[in-house]
Design a protein with these regions (language model features):
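Pyridoxal 5′-phosphate
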Residues: 1-399
Length: 399
């Protein structure tokens, strides 16, 4: 399996501007294929979904196609694919819906490894319902979070556990399958924030064993919206707030208002790009698994090179040494303001923002407060030249 990063880079129009992008964890650049799919949809006759006019058929086919594409990407059932404005919005809606059945004596488990989108919705609605919130904590010295770190908070009163598939700040990847088994042993639900993970590794929600898996296509070469994968049977048991004339059919009952058809066309195009990162035969799911495995191997090698370069910078602190992680690093440098470092890099054409990136609990637990640090993350189009530019700029800064 040969990963052709140069071939992908040729399809990325934003890269022609010359920047080295380490801002992929906040949102990737998009290929021509995705932009073309969005443009073609907007330039065609548009309508709400139906089976009458050609425009109605087109809208319906776009939605059906996007559900199948996301199901292929995640190893999920297309009948359980829900689209929303963002992962944050979807998670808030699901939390509100589930909390209808929570009350005093119930317990909800969240983690200090998570983006706030997989923390605050659960905390808000647990507190409103009178349920107790329990916090799973990672080791700030290593960035590791073991299954035991989570499951020691799970018991007969637990209703739901929410956990990231990979930290968007430090890359740590918990053992989701082990957590899922422990959660289900207590008949609780398991909600996974897969926003950061989905961009870097093959995902199989059935193998993970989670009840809900949420992600965002704009983190893996697609447009801005959110996606939830769940069992259709589970979704049938949930009754979200919705408009009276809106359908009660699953998964549509969870999708408020008219879907953004042009963005859904872009989602399908993004999944097709991922499926074809490595040439080969097979159906789309098989090609996705093969391509994402090749991408993971490629990024692991490039990450090693980036990590070694970062470790050579005087005064630098890297905030994760977790064994299983994505190619994402957050760092600070003694004597330098993180925002000033980011601006210095930007002046040299290296995009590496500084923030807590909404991973507020992570940042605080690491001792970084609300300011966070400088984050550098690899994306499918990252290459060795990008890494060399980053390290050279940091050496210039600290010389």
């Amino acid at each position: 399996m040969t990963y052709d990063v140069d071939g992908l880079r040729m399809r990325m129009p934003a890269l022609k501007e010359g920047a080295a992008h380490f801002d992929g964890p906040g949102g990737t650049q998009i290929p021509d294929d995705v932009a073309d799919a969005i443009d073609a949809t907007l330039r065609s006759a548009v309508s709400n979904r139906g089976r009458g006019t050609a425009a109605e058929w087109r809208a319906d086919d776009i939605v059906t196609g996007a559900r199948q594409a996301m199901a292929d990407l995640l190893g999920a059932d297309p009948r359980g694919i829900v689209f929303g404005r963002s992962m944050t919005q979807i998670t808030m809606d699901i939390a509100r819906t589930l909390a209808q059945d929570w009350g005093p004596g119930d317990e909800i488990v969240v983690s200090r490894l998570d983006h706030d989108a997989d923390v605050r919705p659960w905390v808000i609605h647990a507190e409103r319902a009178g349920a107790t919130v329990r916090w799973a904590e990672f080791d700030p010295a290593t960035g590791e979070m073991t299954a035991h770190d989570v499951l020691r908070h799970v018991g007969p009163k637990t209703r739901l556990v929410a956990l990231t598939g990979a930290s968007n700040l430090i890359g740590t990847r918990p053992d989701l399958a082990a957590v899922a088994a422990g959660v289900h042993a207590h008949d609780a639900l398991f909600y996974v924030d897969g926003v950061h993970l989905t961009a870097h590794a093959p995902v199989d929600v059935a193998a993970i064993g989670c009840d809900f898996y949420a992600c965002s296509p704009y983190k893996f070469l697609g447009p801005h919206l959110g996606v939830l994968a769940a069992s259709p049977d589970l979704l049938e048991t949930l009754h979200p707030d919705k408009l009276l004339p809106a359908t009660n059919v699953v998964p549509e009952r969870f999708e408020l208002g008219t879907l953004p058809y042009e963005l859904l066309a872009g989602v399908t195009a993004a999944v097709d790009v991922l499926a074809d990162l490595v040439p080969g035969d097979g159906d789309r799911r098989q090609r996705i698994v093969r391509s994402m495995a090749a991408l993971e191997e490629y990024e692991d090698g490039l990450h090693t090179r980036m990590r070694e370069g970062l470790e050579s910078i005087p005064g630098i602190t890297l905030y994760s040494n977790a064994k299983h992680r994505t190619p994402t690093e957050t760092f600070t440098i003694d004597g330098y303001d993180s925002q000033a470092i980011s601006e210095f890099l930007a002046e040299r054409g290296v995009n590496a923002p500084a923030s807590n990136f909404y991973a507020l609990e992570v940042s605080r637990w690491l001792g970084l407060g609300d300011a966070g640090g400088v984050r550098v993350g690899l994306a499918p189009y990252s290459n060795a030249d990008d890494v060399e530019r980053l390290i050279a700029a940091l050496r210039e800064l600290t010389a």
